[in-house]
Amino acid sequence: MTKTIAINAGSSSLKWQLYLMPEEKVLAKGLIERIGLKDSISTVKFDGRSEQQILDIENHTQAVKILLDDLIRFDIIKAYDEITGVGHRVVAGGEYFKESTVVEGDVLEKVEELSLLAPLHNPANAAGVRAFKELLPDITSVVVFDTSFHTSMPEKAYRYPLPTKYYTENKVRKYGAHGTSHQFVAGEAAKLLGRPLEDLKLITCHIGNGGSITAVKAGKSVDTSMGFTPLGGIMMGTRTGDIDPAIIPYLMQYTEDFNTPEDISRVLNRESGLLGVSANSSDMRDIEAAVAEWNHEASLAYEMYVDRIQKHIGQYFAVLNGADAIVFTAGVGENAENFRRDVISGISWFGCDVDDEKNVFGVTGDISTEAAKIRVLVIPTDEELVIARDVERLKK
């Protein structure tokens, strides 16, 4: 038995989960927030308890030190060296990293070079790796990429219809995201259906504040909705998803809101989607509450959101030449039963149908009617477990 920790480092946060492997038992989990700011918050959850402390944490190295000391303080481990492996989520692996990789040689430098593709994420992910390397230099460190699962896409799916030089010189292509989640729920869907993953065609829908949909054939991603960045694809909580690119130069010319690249990124990534259309909230719970009060903008935002998701699911029926199941996961996908019902009701002619008695909050598994030809599944995602499994697989 070994202890492995899965890490998701953000620019000012550190989310973690400690596993006993190979049993895959969660021993503890936690979150450190406001790194680099005053009144940082460290939360540790274990054995049904939740312990929190407020202190000033200057950087990721100090955050990792506090995390490790808390594990000892709460008697979860006796010493640092009980942890034999650490896995780090990294958003962008580009074309270079096609699978999870042990951190050695120039791996970390390559991760930092790929910050051009994920400037908000990769630098923070790399900071988390460096912090653990400093404090636990002798254990196996593994980087697990959101994009790796999508490197199986054929060229016709990942290339954009731009002049070739922008691909060869600037690496402009579809990379996708949420790959670890799509990979996990595809595997769980095969177990639930009692069929080999290699025999299945699945449409996996990771729908949270950010969202993406993936066509999975024989366990491999063959197309996905997010593109060069996580801005592409379906409408999301605060992101536009796909729009006509000509809108950008038009608004640059005729408004004061699009003067710089930073302005463009802010509006498209943080001020659009459900939030932008509803002028209310990016949270599906707030949107549904406003819809119930006959709020027109919220109703329109909800209808647009469902519409874009239905269109992408339909598109992937064409890509896969049919599907065996549609899988919902992540915050909205797992918890918003009205949303699932409305998405499926609009594409029921494919042969999918939701049983209202099964489609309730908190229920997971197969929510289809008995007569449905295509199964509709709700499967909680577990990206941290995928990371822990990859660490175990790659340990020396």
From Swiss-Prot:
| Class of this enzyme | transferase
Q: Where does Mg(2+) bind?
A: N8, E383
UniProt GO MF annotations: acetate kinase activity; ATP binding; magnesium ion binding
Q: Which cofactor does it need?
A: Mg(2+); Mn(2+)
Q: Which one GO biological process term can you cite for this protein?
A: acetate metabolic process
Entry's localization field? Cytoplasm
| Pathway in which the depicted protein is active | Metabolic intermediate biosynthesis; acetyl-CoA biosynthesis; acetyl-CoA from acetate: step 1/2
Q: Which InterPro entries match?
A: Ac/propionate_kinase (IPR004372), Aliphatic_acid_kin_short-chain (IPR000890), Aliphatic_acid_kinase_CS (IPR023865), ATPase_NBD (IPR043129)
Arranged from A to Z, the UniProt key words for this protein are: ATP-binding, Cytoplasm, Kinase, Magnesium, Metal-binding, Nucleotide-binding, Transferase
Q: Name one GO cellular component term.
A: cytoplasm
Q: Which Gene3D superfamilies does the record associate with it?
A: 3.30.420.40
> Is Transferase a UniProt keyword of this protein?
yes
What reaction gets catalysed by this protein? acetate + ATP = acetyl phosphate + ADP
Tell whether Metal-binding is among the UniProt keywords: yes
Q: How is the cofactor bound?
A: Mg(2+). Can also accept Mn(2+).
Q: Which residues bind ATP?
A: K15, H206, I207, G208, N209, G210, D283, M284, R285, G331, V332, G333, E334, N335
Q: What does this protein do?
A: Catalyzes the formation of acetyl phosphate from acetate and ATP. Can also catalyze the reverse reaction.
**Family note:** Belongs to the acetokinase family.
- Subunit structure and binding partners: Homodimer.
Q: What is this protein called?
A: Acetate kinase
Look up and give the organism this protein is from.
Streptococcus pneumoniae (strain JJA)
